[in-house]
């Protein structure tokens, strides 16, 4: 991936000696990016222009100035937020090729000598807001597409919500089988979708080419001046046109910057502009009657195929968001912002294709509750913008840290860009926050719940670590005493998993206390997560000899990797340790937590932390340790 001189830590990529192969690969990735990256923003024309016009006209007939003003706002929002902010700047802030708010947080946080708690807090908020968006996108996308049947026949109205629930149930049910096979058709279907919406808009632009005057920003100024109070509310609806822009950055690691940029500039951006302009021309031709312009401008035989295609496109958009939620959750787990959760790999070739049963179930329940509770896409639209605008504002703040501390840009350049982007983000956020009582509370409630859970887990883990360290014996002290006065030694190797390699693990102390024996070779093993997506094998293992009985081993994994302890320990052979899984026993401590008024956290937070800990996946399965080689020792800890 080619990078400008931004000072990024990304390693240079060797140029291919076969340009025709590289060109073919780029085209394939572009096609894939259409289905995964642009599914969300690509389905926004179904409802964005309509909702903006309804807001500007109070549900009555829209005036010519309103139509041109709304269209101009959409055009320039797509240009500034997506093309300039994300395409030109944010996509360059990759963390070893990976993107997303947690990747950006890890990159920014790593630039501080001591990992900044403030940056961690900003990252938690950003991730939580993403989940607020992730539950609304499938609901509003599929619901708005199915509502297209009302244009075909109004008698379909009673079946809109039930059919939407059936489609969503199928989407969530098939997650366990993976998206490898289905994913092959995502790109082509989405390509047909963009071509179809572009052509449907072009037809009406040709009929009324004067609509293209909306490209002039003076219509925005006139719209804002004429009715500032109405314009303020309308801006919140305008933002629906750019929801999904954050997916460009979130999926950076899957496709790379070049295919994402080329797909936007050559296909997505032009087709979106054509469709929005076509909707504007269509409403002008109807003398300002809003209705449902996206579907209504596809007259005659084209209407039903467009409804079917829209439904397929919204399902693909939903799939992209669900996959993104799985990926973000895995990153949060690896960065110790959430407890270990069960992760199932659905592809032998692509490590990024994963399925998380609990996350999938929670998403399905919340999405379906939103569909039933709101009932119409127009009502859901009020709930949509808050979490996305908040996420974009978080990205702007973290981008400023990267520009100043990692890229080493001049301060005035970084401040100028940050002020511009933040001004737009805050403007959109402010216009959306007024919709809290109209439905915006839904996404905020989801985000707040995630923030509370992550904050409790991070805080509780810190308290538990500190308390455990205070009560444990330093490893070096214990190892020295055991060397002087050896207990009975048994053959083989014992590996003790611990989060604190400087202290004697609880499992080791219980083994000495109850069994009075020690293995000939004892390994104190800790697993840490680096602030980068992938760690090369050369940096995977760090070994340190304590004495002839004990050795300290640290395994390092990237936040996008699934820890595999046996495979990582095999690397130790190159460093002199003849690791043999068949003569090795793994000792794990299983803690039973009890709430204590002296933990430093409120009792309710103690109980929440304990509840989260109980949901954690089994360490044996999570670290992929053979079950026949594991010994678990239970302990009770009051926090």
Curated annotation (Swiss-Prot):
Name of the gene this protein is made from: kup1
Domain of life (superkingdom): Bacteria
InterPro entries: K+_transporter, K_trans_C, K_trans_N, Kup
Catalytic activity: K(+)(in) + H(+)(in) = K(+)(out) + H(+)(out)
Pfam family for this entry, one: K_trans_C
Function summary: Transport of potassium into the cell. Likely operates as a K(+):H(+) symporter.
Bilayer topology term: Multi-pass membrane protein
GO cellular component: plasma membrane
Gene Ontology MF terms: potassium ion transmembrane transporter activity; symporter activity
Disulfide cysteine pairs (residue numbers): none
PANTHER family in UniProt: LOW AFFINITY POTASSIUM TRANSPORT SYSTEM PROTEIN KUP (PTHR30540:SF79), OSMOTIC STRESS POTASSIUM TRANSPORTER (PTHR30540)
Taxonomic lineage from the root: Bacteria, Pseudomonadati, Pseudomonadota, Alphaproteobacteria, Hyphomicrobiales
Sequence segments annotated as region (Disordered): 1-21
Keyword terms: Cell inner membrane, Cell membrane, Ion transport, Membrane, Potassium, Potassium transport, Symport, Transmembrane, Transmembrane helix, Transport
Name by which UniProt lists this protein: Probable potassium transport system protein Kup 1
Annotated Polar residues bias: 1-16
Cell location: Cell inner membrane
UniProt organism field: Mesorhizobium japonicum (strain LMG 29417 / CECT 9101 / MAFF 303099) (Mesorhizobium loti (strain MAFF 303099))
Residues that span the membrane, as ranges: 29-49, 67-87, 117-137, 154-174, 182-202, 220-240, 260-280, 302-322, 354-374, 383-403, 411-431, 436-456
Family statement drawn from the similarity comment of this UniProt entry: Belongs to the HAK/KUP transporter (TC 2.A.72) family.
């Amino acid at each position: 991936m080619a990078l400008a001189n931004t000072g990024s830590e990304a390693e240079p990529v060797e140029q291919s000696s076969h340009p025709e192969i590289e060109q073919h690969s780029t085209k394939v990735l572009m096609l894939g990016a259409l289905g995964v990256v642009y599914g969300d923003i690509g389905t926004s024309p179904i409802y964005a222009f309509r909702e903006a016009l309804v807001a500007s006209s109070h549900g009555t007939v829209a005036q010519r100035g309103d139509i041109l003003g709304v269209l101009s706002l959409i055009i320039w929002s797509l240009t500034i937020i997506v093309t300039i902010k994300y395409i030109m700047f944010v996509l360059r802030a990759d963390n070893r090729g990976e993107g997303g708010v947690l990747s950006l947080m890890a990159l920014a946080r790593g630039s501080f000598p001591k990992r900044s708690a403030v940056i961690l807090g900003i990252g938690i908020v950003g991730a939580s807001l993403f989940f607020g968006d992730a539950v609304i996108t499938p609901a509003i996308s599929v619901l708005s597409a199915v509502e297209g049947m009302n244009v075909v026949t109004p008698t379909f109205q009673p079946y809109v919500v039930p059919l939407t629930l059936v489609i969503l149930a199928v989407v969530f049910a098939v997650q366990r089988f993976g998206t490898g096979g289905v994913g092959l058709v995502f790109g082509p279907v989405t390509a047909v979708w963009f071509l179809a919406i572009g052509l449907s808009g072009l037809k009406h632009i040709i009929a009324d080419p004067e609509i293209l005057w909306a490209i002039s920003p003076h219509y925005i100024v006139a719209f804002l001046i004429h009715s500032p109070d109405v314009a303020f509310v309308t801006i919140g609806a305008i933002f629906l046109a750019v929801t999904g822009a954050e997916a460009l950055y979130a999926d950076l690691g899957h496709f790379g910057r070049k295919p994402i940029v080329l797909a936007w500039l050559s296909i997505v951006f032009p087709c979106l502009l054509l469709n929005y302009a076509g909707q504007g021309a269509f409403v002008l031709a109807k003398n300002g009657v809003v209705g449902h312009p996206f579907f209504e401008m596809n007259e005659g035989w084209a209407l039903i195929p467009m409804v079917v295609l829209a439904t397929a496109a919204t399902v693909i958009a939903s799939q992209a968001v669900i996959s993104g939620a799985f990926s973000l959750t895995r990153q949060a787990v690896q960065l110790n912002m959430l407890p270990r959760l069960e992760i199932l790999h659905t592809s032998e070739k692509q490590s990024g294709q994963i399925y998380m049963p609990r996350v999938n179930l929670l998403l399905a329940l919340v999405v379906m509750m939103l569909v039933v509770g709101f009932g119409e896409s127009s009502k859901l639209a009020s709930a949509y913008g808050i979490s996305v605008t908040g996420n974009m504002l978080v990205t702007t703040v973290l981008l400023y840290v990267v520009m100043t501390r990692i890229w080493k840009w001049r301060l005035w350049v970084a401040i100028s860009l940050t002020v511009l982007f933040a001004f737009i983000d805050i403007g959109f956020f402010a216009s959306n926050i007024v919709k809290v009582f109209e439905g915006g509370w839904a996404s905020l409630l989801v985000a707040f719940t995630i923030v509370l859970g992550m904050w409790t887990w991070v805080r509780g883990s810190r308290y538990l670590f500190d308390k455990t360290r205070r009560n444990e014996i330093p490893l070096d002290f214990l190892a020295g005493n055991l060397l002087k006065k050896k207990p009975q030694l048994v053959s083989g190797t014992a590996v003790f998993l611990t989060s604190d390699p400087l202290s004697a693990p609880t499992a080791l102390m219980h083994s000495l206390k109850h069994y009075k024996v020690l293995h000939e070779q004892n390994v104190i093993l800790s697993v840490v997560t680096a602030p980068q997506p992938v760690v090369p094998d050369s940096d995977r293992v760090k070994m340190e000899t304590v004495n002839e009985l004990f050795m300290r081993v640290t395994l390092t994994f990237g936040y996008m990797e699934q820890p595999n302890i046996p495979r990582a320990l095999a690397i130790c052979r190159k460093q002199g340790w003849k690791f043999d899984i068949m003569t090795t026993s793994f000792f794990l401590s299983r803690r039973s937590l009890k709430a204590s008024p002296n933990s430093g956290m409120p009792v309710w937070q103690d109980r929440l932390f304990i509840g989260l800990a109980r949901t954690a996946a089994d360490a044996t399965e999570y670290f992929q340790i053979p079950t026949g080689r594991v010994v678990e020792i239970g302990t009770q800890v009051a926090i």
